Regions:
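Short linear capping/connector segments at secondary-structure termini
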Residues: 163, 201-203, 301-304
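Long, well-ordered core segments of solenoidal/helical folds
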Residues: 183, 187-197, 224-245, 277-296
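Short coil/turn segments at secondary-structure boundaries
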Residues: 197-205, 248-249
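Well-ordered alpha-helical segments within folded domains of soluble proteins
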Residues: 210-221, 230, 251-263, 320-321
């Protein structure tokens, strides 16, 4: 028998980042050498069991630590463990946060949720091994030792940054450092959203929203230039939303798709790509105009539209004289 393997190479890269500082600890006297976690790691467990951060719990005391990775990123967490006396897996709780307060928050409090990207969960880590987990937007991570009367040996805790490795072609600089910072933050935010598709946000909603995509497309065009993720995302919105359905459930978002097509061509001049969707652009506009005419006719009771009428001609001949 002949089998077809459906595989696709990830267009993004992975970068491992060690924490920059320890923000907070709980039961600090039960955590030895937390500073070892700030060392540059290699992602490999080994038999030396040296430079290990050890967290020890009791029946009533359960230590925890909050790490700062220095910048907002999209990705997950890599945990490399050592060799405690007990070989059984250790149960921990992991909390991601874009801020310290979010990483410290309980789910359900002050709007903190696990929607779209799970930011608060329990898991086990192995004896002398490596485990990778998480898929969210974050800067801070809190780790709690949940098991009682256990030791958690941490050789490394590193963030996994997942992003598209593309050059930044555009730049901005002025005498106002606050404006420079705002521009750089906007450029990085959009870069983080350029994942497998162009998302509206790296934590929530992680969806292709046409209304959000247009300002992102404008930013990408100015900062990064032509990149395939834009066309890939425009195509996805088109393919999953056949007419007469509206993209993302809103007619205005279908209109934003048409505007995005126009502006993408304006910046990059890719006529071959634009030609692929000429007909759909026309059909969306025809449908919108037909609805406009129907509303106007219903309100003013001036005309009726036959099935073979062209809405553009009706609008021009009847309401634009």
């Amino acid at each position: 028998a002949c089998f077809t393997l459906h595989a696709r190479k990830d267009e993004r890269v992975r970068e491992y980042i060690s924490p920059e500082r320890i923000v907070w600890t709980q039961e600090a006297e039960r955590i030895s050498h937390p500073e070892y976690l700030l060392r540059e790691g290699n992602g490999q467990a080994d038999l030396t069991n040296s430079h290990i951060c050890v967290m020890k719990s009791s029946d009533t005391a359960h230590p925890a630590i909050l790490l700062d990775f220095g910048k907002e990123l999209h990705g997950g967490l890599q945990i490399v463990t050592g060799m405690p006396g007990d070989h059984s897996p250790v149960r921990i709780r992991v909390r991601f946060g874009e801020s310290v307060s979010e990483a410290m928050a309980e789910s359900g409090s002050k709007g903190v949720t696990n929607d779209h990207a799970v930011r608060d969960f329990e898991m086990t880590v192995p004896w002398l091994g490596v485990r990778e987990t998480g898929n969210s937007g974050f800067r801070f991570v809190r780790i709690d030792l949940l098991d009682s009367n256990r030791e958690l040996h941490l050789k490394e805790v590193r963030a996994i940054s997942i992003y598209r490795d593309i050059p930044q072609r555009g730049s901005f600089s002025c005498s106002d450092e606050r404006l420079n910072h705002i521009w750089a933050t906007g450029a990085r935010t959009v870069h983080l959203c350029m994942q497998d598709y162009l998302w509206d946000g790296i934590k929530r909603d992680r969806l292709v929203w046409m209304g959000d995509m247009h300002p992102e497309i404008m930013t990408i065009s100015h900062v990064f230039g032509h990149t395939d993720v834009v066309q890939k995302s425009l195509d996805l919105a088109r393919d999953i939303t056949p007419l007469p359905n509206w993209m993302s459930g809103m007619y205005t978002y279908s209109l934003w798709w048409v505007v995005a097509q126009r502006d993408w061509y304006h910046f990059h001049g890719d006529m071959e790509y634009l030609k692929q969707d000429f007909r759909l652009d026309e059909e969306i506009l025809e449908l919108i105009l037909r609805l406009i005419v129907e509303v106007m006719c219903s309100n003013r009771k001036m005309i009726r539209i036959a099935s073979d009428d062209k809405p553009v001609e009706i609008v021009r001949s009847t309401f634009m004289k």
